[in-house]
Amino acid sequence: MEVPPPLVLKRPLYVPSKTLMGPGPSNCSHRVLEAMSNPVLGHMHPECLQIMDEVKEGIKYIFQTLNDATMCISGAGHSGMEAALCNLIEDGDVVLMGITGVWGHRAGDMARRYGAEVHYVEASFGRALSHEEITFAFEAHRPKVFFIAQGDSSTGIIQQNIRELGELCRKYDCFLIVDTVASLGGTEFLMDEWKVDVAYTGSQKSLGGPAGLTPISFSKRALTRIRKRKTKPKVYYFDILLIGQYWGCYGTPRIYHHTISSTLLYGLREALAHFCAVGLKAVVRRHQECSKRLQLGIEELGLEMFVSREEERLPTVNTIKVPFGVDWKKVAEYAMRKYSVEISGGLGPTVEHVFRIGLMGENATVERVDMVLSILNEAIQSSKLGIKTDLSKI
């Protein structure tokens, strides 16, 4: 039997233009998109290695770190989570997960697969974790590794006390992993000053790059622990000592580890170059100002933010309570069909409870804020009135 070529691949590729105002990815700039149209390079070509070096310096800047072990994992943000846990955890290690949404549970699932004894400290619904709650959990479990998401995109909660958690982890001889996938670029993060041992982020959110590369950095303290492991990390692909050699992190000759996408490197390089040109503080300030404008607009529309305390609201992924009697799916569908604008529903504990509006990268502008507020209001009013719109004709 011969399998014929699929008819769908005989048609030209068509990709519609959409404004991505959900929890990520965000829209790439023309600069980033144009960069990715450059010719492909071999993964060990000197020109590719040079671009990797430039990307590495950009990552150090956005994390505010001087760590040698700074690089990218080839994979989505989950690969950063896997790499952080895979390298730090050995069988029987006690690991504590901070829970403010879905990501602490996801990390716990991963850690258990690496042989860890996993415990959780969980915040009240719609709240960040207090220092007292975390300290109590440290006393109870004495963890070797503590994981926390600085910003949880499922709930729109920001954990503001990372600096204090760095001190707490040093006091208990514990290693601090911080997930900054949804927060970096939209809020302050000082890896070295706050004594964070491992940090990783996503390339496709506030950075405005393509998905598929995950910036990650390990402190000297974390690197020492990894080098003293009794066993090798359980996943070869995530072995940071090997990946770091490929990225030229340790002053040793570069080795082949895997075939990195030069195309994705070009895009991330230009996204980082934009951050450097504008300045990290200015980028953070723009994201925060846009979030405040959105929150004021939500209040004026008679809607309510999901996170009650303003200081605990994540600027990049804003969560709004779904009004009683409104079907969030119909609202999201209306926005997409009529305006090609993405407005997302909840994730994990917030499914059917919230809308999620992302203000990240190219979409963190006053114009985009005003646009999404107008569309959200129109879509909700349409839903409340029970207007049966034939969306296929919009």
Curated annotation (Swiss-Prot):
Pyridoxal 5'-phosphate binds at residues 76-78, 153, 204, 256, 259. One of its GO terms (biological process) is glyoxylate catabolic process. Disruption phenotype: RNAi-mediated knockdown causes accumulation of calcium oxalate crystals in Malpighian tubules. Its cofactor is pyridoxal 5'-phosphate. The modification N6-(pyridoxal phosphate)lysine is found at residue 205. It is found in: Peroxisome. Belongs to the class-V pyridoxal-phosphate-dependent aminotransferase family. This is Alanine--glyoxylate aminotransferase.
